[in-house]
Structure formats: structure tokens, C-alpha cells
Design a protein with these regions (language model features):
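Core SAM-dependent methyltransferase catalytic element
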Residues: 141-160
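Class I SAM-dependent methyltransferase SAM/SAH-binding core
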Residues: 2-44
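A short acidic, Gly/Pro-enriched loop at the edge of an enzyme's catalytic core
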Residues: 42-56
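A short glycine-rich, Lys/Arg-flanked "PGG" loop and its adjoining helix->strand segment in the class I
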Residues: 73-90
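Short "lid" loop at the C-terminus of a central beta-strand within the Rossmann-like core
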Residues: 99-104
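Conserved Class I S-adenosyl-L-methionine
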Residues: 106-135
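Conserved beta-strand signature within the Rossmann-like core of class I S-adenosyl-L-methionine
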Residues: 91-98
Length: 160
């Protein structure tokens, strides 16, 4: 049975892969029994390793700061990508749908603190580059698809 996790899901998790079991994580508490509460900018994804076939993030990645200084310097976006890698099983898929540069939607919301480009996932988290490894990224993804849907960059990565 396929299991999927939707990050920053609000009250209803997305399920684009038609998984049998769907879970969510949101900063707001008590949304539904299948939705865990966590601030993913500073907390781990509250599920075990290798648990999901799919992890999705709709309109979420842009809200996770790249770096925070509380109480010490942390690369919170890189830490989140490590967490996504950790909870995905081998060959699991991560789907990100996020407003991205050069579109105004990437900048206009003051809570958009992580500006994504076509190169962000390709060069920093996918083979053969994995440039984020110098900032602590320990995973390894393969970029399997990337395209634009309006102002949103739609990216699919496979855990290798």
C-alpha cells in the first residue's frame, strides 16, 4: 500500500499520486487525525525513516528560510531536504510545486523567504552536482521532471 506525505498541507493533504494512505504535516495544530503538527523550518518531519513512497510540497518550500540564526546558524532548507530524503523510501518521489523566479509570485508574498529557480533542485540536491552537500545535505536525488505550470515550478526528484 502506497503512503504519501504532504508538507504544509493545511486541513486537506494533496494526493496527486493516488496513494492508499495520505498523511500531512502543518504548523497549525489539530487539523485532522492524519495531519501531524510541526514547524518544519526548525523541527524534523515527525515520521519514521523510509516510510513514504511519495512526499509532496505545494506552495510550501518558498516559506522555509534558507538560513536561520536561532540560537545558532542553521541551514533550515537543507535540513528540510535531508528530512524529505530520510522519510522517503528508496526510489520514492518528492514533488515540489512552488512559485519561482523570475515570476513576481515568487517575491510578492512577504512570507516567501526561499526563492526557488530552475537550478535550485537540479544543482543543489540532484546528482551529479549535489552542491548543497557543502551545507550539510547528505541525500542523493535524481531530477526526473521539471516544468512550469503558470508561475509555479513543478519539480520531481527520485531518492537514489
Amino acid at each position: 500500500m502506497a503512503k504519501a506525505l504532504d508538507l504544509g498541507c493545511g486541513p486537506i493533504p494533496n494526493n496527486p499520486f493516488k496513494a492508499n494512505e495520505i498523511f500531512g504535516v502543518d504548523i497549525v495544530s489539530n487539523l485532522a487525525p492524519n495531519i501531524a503538527t510541526a514547524d518544519l523550518a526548525i523541527e524534523a518531519i515527525p515520521f519514521p525513516a523510509n516510510y513514504f513512497q511519495y512526499v509532496t510540497a505545494y506552495q510550501f518550500i518558498e516559506h522555509v528560510p534558507r538560513v536561520i540564526y536561532a540560537p545558532t546558524r542553521r541551514n533550515s532548507f537543507v535540513e528540510l531536504m535531508n528530512e524529505i530524503y530520510r522519510v522517503l523510501e528508496k526510489d520514492g518521489i518528492f514533488l515540489s510545486v512552488t512559485p519561482a523566479y523570475p515570476h513576481n509570485a515568487a517575491f510578492q508574498d512577504p512570507t516567501h523567504v526561499n526563492i526557488i529557480t530552475e537550478e535550485t533542485f537540479r544543482f543543489y540536491f540532484a546528482m551529479p552536482n549535489r552542491w548543497a552537500s557543502i551545507y550539510g545535505f547528505t541525500g542523493s536525488f535524481e531530477l526526473i521532471a521539471q516544468d512550469w505550470m503558470g508561475v509555479n515550478l513543478v519539480t520531481q526528484l527520485r531518492k537514489t
